Amino acid sequence: MQTLASRPSLRASARVAPRRAPRVAVVTKAALDPQIVISGSTAAFLAIGRFVFLGYQRREANFDSTVGPKTTGATYFDDLQKNSTIFATNDPAGFNIIDVAGWGALGHAVGFAVLAINSLQGANLS
C-alpha cells in the first residue's frame, strides 16, 4: 500500500507566477456629453413650443371651445376655464405648466434618442 507522500503527483513542484503586464489607465469618454445633449434638446423644444407652436395650439383650442357642446349657453370649455386657477400664468402669451411639461418631455425624448443613436456608432450589430 502506498502512502500519501509517495504517490506520484501531477503538480509542478515549484509554482511560478506568470508575469503581469503593467496596468495602464484606460479612460473611456463619450462622444457627446449627456447633460449637454439633454439640456440643449429640452431648451430647444421649450423655445420652439413657446415661440413657434403656441399660436397654433391656442388657435386650435379656441376652435374647439366654440364648436363644443353647449349646456346653459356656455360651452364646457368656458365652464372649465372659470375654475382653472392652477393654470394661471404671468407669461404674456399664456405658456403654462402643462405646456412646459409637454414640450419638456418631448425635448427629453429627443435628447435620449440622440444619445442612443450616437452610442450605436461603431457597434457591430450584424
Curated annotation (Swiss-Prot):
This is Photosystem I reaction center subunit V, chloroplastic. Pfam families: PSI_PSAK. Not yet known. Belongs to the PsaG/PsaK family. It is found in: Plastid, Chloroplast thylakoid membrane. It comes from Chlamydomonas reinhardtii. NCBIfam families: PS_I_psaG_plant. Keywords: Chloroplast, Membrane, Photosynthesis, Photosystem I, Plastid, Thylakoid, Transit peptide, Transmembrane, Transmembrane helix. It comes from the Eukaryota. InterPro entries: PSI_PsaG, PSI_PsaG/PsaK, PSI_PsaG/PsaK_dom, PSI_PsaG/PsaK_pln.
